[in-house]
A protein has these predicted regions:
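Short, positively charged and aromatic/hydrophobic N-terminal segments
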Residues: 2-4, 9
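N-terminal beta1-alpha1 cap of cysteine-dependent amidohydrolase-like domains
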Residues: 13-200
Length: 200
């Protein structure tokens, strides 16, 4: 550790000052971890992704709108973010669950760290979770809603969780689509293809 490196010192400070957080499943099961991004509470149906790379594409994928994303990849954040790799105009997941979250990143064309990106997008995440154990659990028990939170009143969190609607049958396309027409590519091209944006 080099105390003269201000960037490293800042990242180390953020790592050591993380707050305790919990992952609460709809059946009452609790997993303990550390918070990333904003404090507070985030909720949604818990789902998981086993991809080894491409976390930024996953977080901005409209098909995951409103879900708590559990990443089974052991390291999240280690190559930062690049705005050219987003799948939509903003993060679409409601929160992130991961094992190891990296405040340091190493990539030539990275534009920022993932934790700074989360803070700008007002996203909450929880790390230090045994993600493989959670995947095995929800794979056996089935899809369910969940909450991640820095709050400590479990009974109050259970009440909030009970009020979260089931995603089955929810109309979500309008929340990730656009209200205006727009172009990809050359507007003067000879051949044109029309597409209905339900979350491109």
């Amino acid at each position: 550790f080099d105390p003269t490196n201000k960037k490293r010192h800042y990242e180390r400070m953020k790592y050591t000052q993380r707050k305790k957080a919990i992952l609460l499943l709809a059946d009452g099961t609790i997993f303990e971890g550390k918070s990333i991004g904003r404090d507070g509470t985030a909720f949604g149906e818990i789902c998981y992704n086993t991809g080894m790379t491409g976390y930024q594409e996953i977080f901005t994928d409209p098909s995951y709108f409103g879900q708590l994303m559990l990443a089974t990849n052991a390291h999240i954040g280690n190559y930062g973010i690049n705005e050219e790799e987003i799948e939509s105009n903003s993060i679409k997941i409601s929160g992130l669950i991961c094992k190891n979250f990296s405040f340091n990143f190493s990539r030539v064309n990275a534009q920022d760290s993932l934790d700074n990106y989360f803070e700008k997008q007002n996203l909450m995440a929880i790390s230090d979770i045994d993600t493989r154990a959670v995947v095995r659990y929800i794979r056996d028990k089935g899809a369910m809603n969940a909450i991640i939170s820095t709050e400590t009143d479990i009974d109050a969190l259970k009440e909030k969780l009970n009020a979260v609607p089931n995603m089955k049958g929810l109309e979500l396309a309008s929340k990730v689509s656009t209200t205006e027409s727009y172009y990809f590519g050359d507007e003067q091209a000879t051949y044109k293809i029309s597409a209905l944006d339900l979350g491109i």
